[in-house]
Amino acid sequence: YMGVVEMYRATGNPRYLELSKNLIDIRGMVENGTDDNQDRIPFRDQYSAMGHAVRANYLYAGVADVYAETGEQQLMKNLTSIWNDIVTRKMYVTGACGALYDGTSPDGTCYEPDSIQKVHQSYGRPYQLPNSTAHNETCANIGNMLFNWRMLEVTGDAKYADLVETCLYNSVLSGIS
């Protein structure tokens, strides 16, 4: 998403912007899609953070780029709701996110043994933020920072800058060894 929008910005070729919009539109079109791959439901129906945290955060950052170019209000509505869900219910004070290393999707389970969706390195249920088993992969935290950076760019709201700083100095910097 982000790379395709950057190609559009660099070349001015509208096919790249169209491709980025199509990549959002295909979310949820896969039969038996999963939270892990961000394709269980259409993006425009998503109002909470779900699934693999790296894929999720990079998707959210890319959607913010598409919003910056198109101004589609539905995308901002989704992004704002997802951001609020992350910040108020699925993020540690360090800015870290993606608490679960391994588990089952809190939303994509049909309660039939062969269709329970497994997730890894993912967002869990609201307030499911364990101490001793927190995964909080560095890549997810970089994605969180990229998502907040783009939200700052499109809104100018300092709350996004605050989280860029929180993530950078805590959950991202700690990944450097």
Model-derived regions, located:
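Glycan-recognition and catalytic cores of secretory/periplasmic carbohydrate-active enzymes
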Residues: 1-177
